[in-house]
């Protein structure tokens, strides 16, 4: 029997009601943020950045229920990279530009242990389920109140995306990468099953990307995403990171 090389589990949770808005951008926007040892991962020659909003539920740290904030929202801005291994394999992963949560404690833990750019803001969400019709999903955040909003009407129909689709590219990056100063690049594994996708045509994105992220992303406030879709989600496991 072979010995598992997987790292120990750091965090497990349910990720639910995920909204994705995916924008085509020029690679030069993201190249300064690419962690050492990785490179941008393109889809059909195009570079993407994604706004993702979802719910954490039943959060467990080191296999123990979180004492506080087991259920909360997250909104993140992310892009996609890959790392070539010596044996020829390729690991496809995500780099987070900024992750917004409603708790200062959660933000501190994530910054300290993973070097991720987490911040705490006021947040809210609303999920309206209609078992016979569309689902209404809304997330919002802001400094003085939830003034930035991402909402959508989600149809009931869903499908498993094919391996070469944009939806598969967006949802099936199973590694995370961050640069933590003197520690260099940290790589961690994220495990979840393949998610069925609901295509979304009715949505509203009212975000001040400049104030939330940086002036370089201000153009996204006036841009239309290439695609918007929804995933119900699943249980997710995040393993301890390691320097690469």
Give the ranges of each region predicted by the language model:
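Hydrophobic, proline/glycine-rich low-complexity stretches
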Residues: 1-62, 213-244
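Aromatic-enriched hydrophobic runs in primary sequence
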Residues: 9-10, 30, 54-56, 66-79, ...
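Short beta-strand element of the conserved SAM-dependent methyltransferase core
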Residues: 21-23, 79, 202
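Generic structural motif
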Residues: 26-28, 54-59, 82-86, 102, ...
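Surface-exposed beta-strand edges and their flanking turn/coil or helix-capping segments
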Residues: 33-35, 54-55, 63-67, 108-112, ...
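Feature targets compositionally biased, intrinsically disordered low-complexity regions
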Residues: 44, 87, 92, 180-183
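Interaction-surface and assembly-scaffold signal
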Residues: 116-244
């Amino acid at each position: 029997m072979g010995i598992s090389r997987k790292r120990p589990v750091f965090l497990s949770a349910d990720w639910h009601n995920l909204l994705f808005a995916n924008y085509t951008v020029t690679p030069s926007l993201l190249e300064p943020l690419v962690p050492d040892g990785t490179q941008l991962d393109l889809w059909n020659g195009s570079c993407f950045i994604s706004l993702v909003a979802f719910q954490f539920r039943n959060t467990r740290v080191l296999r123990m229920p979180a004492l506080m904030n087991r259920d909360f929202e997250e909104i993140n801005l992310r892009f996609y990279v890959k790392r070539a291994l010596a044996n020829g394999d390729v690991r496809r992963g995500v780099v987070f530009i900024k992750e917004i949560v409603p708790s200062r404690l959660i933000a501190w833990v994530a910054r300290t242990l993973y070097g991720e750019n987490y911040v705490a803001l006021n947040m809210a969400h609303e999920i309206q389920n209609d078992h016979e019709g569309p689902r209404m999903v809304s997330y919002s955040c802001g400094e003085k109140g939830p003034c930035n909003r991402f909402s959508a009407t989600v149809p009931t129909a869903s499908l498993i995306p094919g391996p070469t689709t944009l939806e598969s590219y967006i949802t099936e990056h199973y590694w995370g990468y961050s640069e933590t100063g003197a520690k260099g690049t940290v790589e961690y594994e994220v495990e979840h099953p393949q998610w069925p996708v609901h295509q979304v045509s009715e949505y509203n994105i009212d975000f001040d990307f400049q104030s939330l992220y940086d002036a370089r992303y201000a153009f996204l406030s006036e841009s239309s995403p290439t695609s918007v879709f929804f995933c119900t989600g699943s249980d997710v496991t995040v393993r301890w990171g390691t320097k690469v």
